[in-house]
């Protein structure tokens, strides 16, 4: 890809050495995860450097500015759109960014997170949270807009893994899809 070529050219011109490659491991778009993983694995294999996958939902958590959040007890709930009224989500501790529940593909309805919201404040964010805002109605539910899993938020998480030697085997790493790929039916005559 042209962007990768430009980035590597810039690194050569600046005299930068690549020590590892970090990537968002999912959940997320099937195609996006496949393309990103293929590029990252190719770079790691070709340059004989480590691969560092980072949980996409954790990257979303790292992007929340601390000044937007209270100092009292609450949880972070990143949400990635998984089509219709479904989201990829999990709960995270606000200080450590450690996952406190399993990552799931959750269909959102009026009862979603009702038990958790009865016990604590939850901050929802990510591209899946917007569609949930009118469905999840509770005084302890707060929504933060315009939060994306950008590389600049992944960098500190990846650096920590790098320093701790937390690498994946390049040959066997697969992204975290969470759901099986279901191709849409073709609308092109002759491919049906």
Task: Outline where the language-model segments fall.
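N-terminal beta-alpha supersecondary unit
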Residues: 1-27
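Residues at secondary-structure transition points
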Residues: 2, 30, 34, 38, ...
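Short amphipathic alpha-helical face segments that pack within enzyme cores
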Residues: 2-3, 38, 59, 153-157
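DPxDG-like acidic metal-binding loop motif
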Residues: 20-56
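Surface "functional belts" at beta-alpha junctions
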Residues: 50-149, 177, 182-183, 187
């Amino acid at each position: 890809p042209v962007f990768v070529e430009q980035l590597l050219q810039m690194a050569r011109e600046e005299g930068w050495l690549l020590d590892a490659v970090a990537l968002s491991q999912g959940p997320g778009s099937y195609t996006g995860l496949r393309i990103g993983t293929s590029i990252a694995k190719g770079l790691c294999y070709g340059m004989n450097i480590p691969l560092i996958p980072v949980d996409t939902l954790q990257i979303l958590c790292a992007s929340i500015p601390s000044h937007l959040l209270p100092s009292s007890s609450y949880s972070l709930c990143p949400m990635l759109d998984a089509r219709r009224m479904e989201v990829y989500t999990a709960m995270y501790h606000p200080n450590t960014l450690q996952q406190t529940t399993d990552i799931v593909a959750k269909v959102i309805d009026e009862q979603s997170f009702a038990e958790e919201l009865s016990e604590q404040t939850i901050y929802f964010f990510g591209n899946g949270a917007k569609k949930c805002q009118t469905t999840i109605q509770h005084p302890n539910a707060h929504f933060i807009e315009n939060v994306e899993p950008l590389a600049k938020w992944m960098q500190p998480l990846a650096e920590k893994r790098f320093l701790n030697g937390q690498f994946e085997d390049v040959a066997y790493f697969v992204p975290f899809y969470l759901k099986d790929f279901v191709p849409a039916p073709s609308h092109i005559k002759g491919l049906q």
